[in-house]
Curated annotation (Swiss-Prot):
Glycosylation site residues: N109
Similarity section: Belongs to the serine esterase family.
Protein name, entry field: Lysophosphatidylserine lipase ABHD12
Entry EC no(s): 3.1.-.-, 3.1.1.23
Taxonomic lineage: Eukaryota, Metazoa, Chordata, Craniata, Vertebrata
Broad enzyme group: hydrolase
Length: 382
């Protein structure tokens, strides 16, 4: 009986131990669950912290961008000379590694580089490209030969380039080649402050340089036709120049405007650079008045009322730098000009599908026919 009682006590003790063990296991599981919950909460808090940090960084970036956005017009208003640099972009030299003294490096083997002095202390770089038919004869010739070549029967085009770059810019060189192949002498130059020309840029200085070159050419070609071709900002210089010549009673034989605008204020307002500020209250006061403060106008819309020679306007519909509508508006003004009454005024649009944009009209296979039709003369090939 004692054994059975002992056995019962042992069983009871074992059961109690097992029960206690189960209780401990339960406590262990509870502990594990408790440990798991805080871990999940920690991860969630970590994710929230990371999201909060990211949002804070984004807020800081937005604040910086807003500060810059506000600061730029204020800086330009306080320092209007900055706006002049943005109009001229003469400090942008593309391609940079080009020796303007060696036009042959650009494939211009019938081009002579030289320098002229429109006023004391200012030397400007000039290129003279002879007609392609004179290419062989032009090889290794000196300045005297090139100057005498003006005595040929070929007409001359004075080319006035736009802002940025130099007279050696690729799209400009390609146009010289096209015009040379059509039998024209092409004379082009870098305004003061551009390329290897001395001095600082200004509208008055650019126009004076163009007038000096025109007179220099005219003295050497006699009665032969002399046409003025302006591109982009160069159209503003061209209309300034032609207005002066017409006021003197000595108009050029024709004026060709490629991708022109009406005036610099309208062009600046339409330029892609102004897109982020165009609808800002006070845009004119901050940006456009800063241009006027530098005495920069390029008022072609006013100049056409004083021009008395044939005018041809070329403009691509997909031009994003000088919008097509500005060229069309200038044409409409020119067509109504009393001073142009009796002179041919023609507007040639180029479809967007052609992809000529701002500076590739030279690629048009129709360009030779357009020029010969406008100038009322066949091209002087050879």
């Amino acid at each position: 009986m004692r054994k059975r009682k002992g056995s019962a006590d042992h069983d009871s003790s074992f059961t109690a131990t097992l029960t206690d063990g189960s209780s401990d296991l339960k406590q262990c599981h509870k502990g594990t669950d408790a440990d798991t919950d805080p871990g999940g909460s920690g991860k969630e808090m970590g994710r929230r912290c990371r999201r909060g940090g990211l949002m804070w960084r984004l807020r800081r970036i937005l604040i910086w961008l807003l500060g810059i956005y506000i600061a730029i017009p204020v800086i330009i208003k306080v320092c209007p000379s900055i706006q002049a640099k943005l109009v001229f972009l003469n400090f942008v030299r593309v391609p940079y590694f080009i020796d303007l003294k060696r036009p042959q490096d650009q494939g211009m083997n019938h081009t002579h580089n030289f320098y002229l002095q429109p006023e004391e202390g200012i030397n400007i770089g000039v290129w003279h490209t002879v007609p392609a038919g004179m290419w062989r004869e032009a090889q290794a010739k000196d300045a005297e030969w090139y100057e005498k070549s003006f005595q040929s029967s070929h007409p001359v085009i004075l080319y006035l380039h736009g802002n940025a770059g130099t007279r050696g810019g690729d799209h400009r060189v390609q146009l010289y080649k096209v015009l040379s192949s059509l039998g024209y002498h092409v004379v082009t130059f870098d305004y003061r402050g551009w390329g290897d020309s001395e001095g600082s840029p200004s509208e008055r200085g650019m126009t004076s340089d163009a007038l000096f070159l025109y007179q220099w050419i005219k003295q050497r070609i006699g009665p032969k036709p002399l046409y003025i071709w302006g591109h982009s900002l160069g159209t503003g210089v061209a209309t300034n120049l032609v207005r002066r010549l017409c006021d003197r009673g000595t108009p050029p034989d024709a004026l060709i405007l490629e991708s022109p605008f009406t005036n610099i204020r309208e062009e600046a307002k339409s330029h892609p650079f102004s897109m982020v500020y165009r609808y800002l209250p006070g845009f004119d006061w901050f940006f456009l008045d800063a241009i006027s403060a530098n005495d920069i106008r390029f008022a072609s819309d006013e100049n056409v009322n004083h021009i008395s020679c044939p005018v041809l306007i070329l403009h691509a519909e997909d031009d994003t730098v000088v919008p097509f509508q500005l060229g069309k508006k200038l044409y409409d003004l020119a067509a109504q000009s009393k001073s142009l009454n009796g002179h041919k005024v023609q507007f040639i649009p180029f479809s967007s599908s052609l992809g000529y944009r701002h500076k590739f009209i030279y690629k048009s296979p129709q360009l030779p026919n357009i020029l010969s039709d406008f100038l009322r003369a066949p091209h002087p090939h050879g």
